[in-house]
Structures are given as structure tokens and as C-alpha cells.
UniProtKB/Swiss-Prot annotation:
Disulfide bonds: C8-C36, C15-C30, C20-C37
GO BP field: defense response to bacterium
Protein's UniProt keywords contain Secreted: yes
Protein name as annotated: Ostricacin-3
Keywords per UniProt: Antibiotic, Antimicrobial, Defensin, Disulfide bond, Secreted
Coiled-coil boundaries: none
GO CC annotation: extracellular region
Role according to the record: Has antibacterial activity against the Gram-positive bacterium S.aureus 1056 MRSA (MIC=2.78 ug/ml) and the Gram-negative bacterium E.coli O157:H7 (MIC=2.41 ug/ml). Does not have antifungal activity against the yeast C.albicans 3153A.
Annotated source species: Struthio camelus (Common ostrich)
Location of the protein in the cell: Secreted
Entry keyword rRNA processing: no
Amino acid sequence: IPRPLDPCIAQNGRCFTGICRYPYFWIGTCRNGKSCCRRR
């Protein structure tokens, strides 16, 4: 059974601890409380 995708990952984002750094920008929060970042 595939586990449900994090909404962040579904939006092509990645979960980072702390702030997003270039070339990523913040698009939300992951389920685990980390920052959801996506490439520009």
C-alpha cells in the first residue's frame, strides 16, 4: 500500500529543516513541521 504523498511533495516541493535557501522558495509546511520548498 503506497503511503499518502505529503501535499508538499505532491506540489513538486521538498521538505527542509529551517528556512529555504536559494534556489528554493517557501511554499508551505510539510506534515512533519519542516519547511516545504520548491525550486524557482
